[in-house]
């Protein structure tokens, strides 16, 4: 156990520790209370009103005491003032007073009565009598003077004030520069005395120039002189200013035009870039006029069939050669143009295929063959043979110039007028075997005219009497058969040739060349519903058309 301390331990003082004592806080004075007392001690001020200004003007105008003007005492009652006003109004009224100043005197009388009959305004007038009017030390004095000035006087006063203010500003600028120069000079002198830093020679030269430039304001620095000098200089420089303005306007116009041209070129370039594909201009189609046949030699019907066959064979060979050489390939655009032209020139229009060929820039044969191919590819009528099959058979049969029979696939079916069907004549036993083997396949019906020709009996002697002929049944049947044949030929001649029949005729002419046996009979068998005479007549017509085309080209 430790013994208890007899004396408490003493801490070292602040000075022993080396600490600086804090300064005592400053005494707090009640500044807020002082400000409040000052504000409360300020007396309320009263501003001047329009009534006061009118009263000041009336006092200056009358130049007399209002009580003396009415002839009453200053402490008179309102009744005494009213009586005095009535008496003076009877004497000073303009109708009874012939004096020149009667109107002004009567107006002053009314104004004095209006002031004295009101207690408040009378009290203000009594204060003016004691204290007098406001003097130059009060702002209302100048305000009253300015109110009475005209516009010209106000403008002159304002101009004088501005002139004085401008001159004072000029002097203030001069004095400020002088002060700056003086301070800078003192600094330079101090630097020279101390010698701590070298003084720059260029700065000294600049300070000397500034001293020379500093000049006291002269009379021509006044505002009126400055305005006059500025006006003269503007008049002198006015032509140059106008010229500069014209040049500036011309440059502005040129820039605007250039901007417009640039904008147009940009828009054109943008449109050209946007146009990916330029549409072809539609050609102007000439009005089709059929060729006049007056200058074309008519067909000589006296020519032999051999000459006609030679001409037709030459024409077919030339047409095939030109088609192989000149016919370009058909593109999708050409096909679409062909369909549009076929819609534009429907069937029945004169010179339809010539117009379509002129529009496409191709030959008539090329256009017709392509149109036929399109029709065959879309639809194929029952009972007819496809042109592609016929062409393939023709091309395969060309190198072999021997007369061969058509295969069963290419044999067309047809019905005669009476609806009687007969099998084709076959040579020998092989024909009978083929007919037995091909019963399931489509079989060609034999025309009625061939049956009639085979079943027809040989003509008897022409010297038989007419009476006996009338009673002969065979002769009557023969005459009726001849009439029916004539009617059928006339009907078939009247029927128009279709495109399929025309194509079959052309293919048959190529398949059975000139010199083959029974050529026209075989050709007539290939063309449905057409006889041998019809095929020959059509052949002659085609030859005539070829001759006309050759003459037209030459």
Curated annotation (Swiss-Prot):
Interacts (via J domain) with HSPA5. Interacts (via cytosolic domain) with ribosomes. Interacts (via SANT 2 domain) with SERPINA3; the interaction delays the formation of the covalent inhibitory complex SERPINA3-chymotrypsin, but does not alter the catalytic activity of SERPINA3. Interacts (via SANT 2 domain) with ITIH4 (via C-terminus); the interaction protects ITIH4 against in vitro cleavage by kallikrein. Residues 455-472, 483-494 have a biased composition (Basic and acidic residues). SUPFAM superfamilies: Chaperone J-domain (SSF46565), Homeodomain-like (SSF46689). Residues 48-153 are lumenal. GO terms for cellular component: endomembrane system; endoplasmic reticulum; endoplasmic reticulum membrane; membrane; nuclear membrane; plasma membrane. Residues 175-554 are cytoplasmic. This is DnaJ homolog subfamily C member 1. It is a single-pass type I membrane protein. Residues 421-432, 473-482 have a biased composition (Acidic residues). InterPro entries: DnaJ_domain, DnaJ_domain_CS, DnaJ_domain_protein, Homeodomain-like_sf, J_dom_sf, SANT/Myb, SANT_dom. Gene3D superfamilies: DnaJ domain (1.10.287.110), Homeodomain-like (1.10.10.60). It is found in: Endoplasmic reticulum membrane; Nucleus membrane; Microsome membrane.
